[in-house]
């Protein structure tokens, strides 16, 4: 439900969503991994391949396609199925990037510092060099990082404010982030153990 007081927020979020799709569509992914097996995995998934029941029939990157986690490719292939434009699958990088910015800002909002510093620090947290260099590609390290930031921030906010919304964001970030690559399972697992 859109109330009068959160209409500007909805407009900003919708604009960022549209931006994510448009910028992903017009910027071609020229990364090796992106072209070699991430996009091929998405094509296989779009064409009905179920990695639980069978091996892919891919001719390129078969080892990586069949054996690596497919969290990012699954999300991207859903976008690809919806739009029929493979490059638009990269919009998940932008969406996760914006989510990490807003989650960081939400945590920094709890501190007694100037608003401009909160925005600056949230920007620096979300838009770090790895994220900036990978947001236009199907590389997945930036996506792991963005989900980890969301996971960390949502747990901080949940412990501070006790709102279930933050717990749901934490669980979603944890599940999505840990399904992207094998090392992300370790990263998120260590985080959970340290809680």
Tell me what each language-model feature is.
Residues 120-126, 153, 174-178:
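Short helix- or helix-capping micro-motifs
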Residues 71-92:
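Juxtamembrane segments of multi-pass membrane glycosylation machinery
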Residues 155, 166-182, 188-193:
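Membrane-interface alpha helices of multi-pass inner-membrane proteins
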Residues 110, 151-166:
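Membrane-interface transmembrane helices that cradle and orient dolichyl/undecaprenyl
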Residues 130-144:
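Short acidic/glycine- and proline-prone juxtamembrane loop motifs at membrane-interface regions
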Residues 27-41, 47-75:
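Extracytoplasmic catalytic/substrate-binding loops of multi-pass membrane glycan-assembly enzymes
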């Amino acid at each position: 439900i859109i109330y009068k007081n959160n209409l500007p927020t909805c407009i900003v979020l919708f604009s960022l969503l549209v931006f994510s799709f448009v910028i992903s569509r017009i910027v071609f992914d020229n990364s090796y991994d992106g072209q070699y097996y991430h996009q091929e995995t998405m094509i296989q998934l779009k064409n009905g391949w179920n990695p639980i029941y069978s091996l892919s029939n891919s001719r390129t990157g078969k080892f990586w396609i069949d054996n690596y986690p497919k969290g990012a490719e699954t999300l991207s292939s859903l976008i690809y199925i919806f739009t029929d434009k493979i490059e638009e699958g990269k919009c998940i990088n932008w969406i996760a990037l914006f989510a990490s910015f807003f989650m960081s800002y939400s945590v920094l909002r709890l501190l007694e510092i100037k608003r401009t510093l909160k925005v600056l620090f949230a920007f620096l947290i979300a838009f770090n060099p790895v994220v900036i260099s990978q947001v236009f590609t199907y590389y997945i390290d930036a996506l792991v990082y963005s989900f980890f930031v969301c996971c960390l921030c949502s747990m901080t906010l949940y412990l501070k404010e006790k709102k279930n919304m933050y717990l749901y964001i934490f669980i979603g970030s944890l599940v999505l982030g840990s399904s992207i690559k094998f090392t992300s399972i370790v990263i998120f697992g260590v985080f959970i153990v340290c809680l």
